[in-house]
């Protein structure tokens, strides 16, 4: 008798959660969506107008301004950069899309940093 124990794929569960949430939230020109993607090595943030299908502002750990520090410290800098770039384009209010990730750690650090630097959500 063979018993197969399968471990749930956390990324598949996250993607399913993200698809479910994306059905409910959408970014407009007046209030675009602040989307987060978190990988093992980096974190990426985009301010997106879903109606027009364009990215209005973005920042990531690949930017030259973000290089030193722990991953959480880098997330704080990415939050600051994306907020500054969005505010420079006249965007002050966004809808926060955490990408199916838990609001904890790097995602929370990025969100709080973006709030401190002028984005409202």
UniProtKB/Swiss-Prot annotation:
Keywords for the protein's UniProt record, in alphabetical order: Ribonucleoprotein, Ribosomal protein, RNA-binding, rRNA-binding
Q: Does the keyword Membrane apply?
A: no
| Name by which UniProt lists this protein | Large ribosomal subunit protein uL18
What InterPro entries does UniProt report for this protein, alphabetically?
Ribosomal_uL18_bac-type, Ribosomal_uL18_bac/euk
Q: Does the keyword rRNA-binding apply?
A: yes
Q: How does it assemble?
A: Part of the 50S ribosomal subunit; part of the 5S rRNA/L5/L18/L25 subcomplex. Contacts the 5S and 23S rRNAs.
Output one GO MF annotation.
structural constituent of ribosome
Assigned protein family: Belongs to the universal ribosomal protein uL18 family.
Q: Could you give one GO CC term from the UniProt record?
A: cytosolic large ribosomal subunit
What this protein is reported to do is described as:
This is one of the proteins that bind and probably mediate the attachment of the 5S RNA into the large ribosomal subunit, where it forms part of the central protuberance.
Q: Which domain of life is it from?
A: Bacteria
Q: What are the GO BP annotations of this UniProt entry? A: translation
Q: Which SUPFAM superfamilies match?
A: Translational machinery components
Originating organism? Streptococcus suis (strain 05ZYH33)
Q: What gene name is listed for this protein? A: rplR
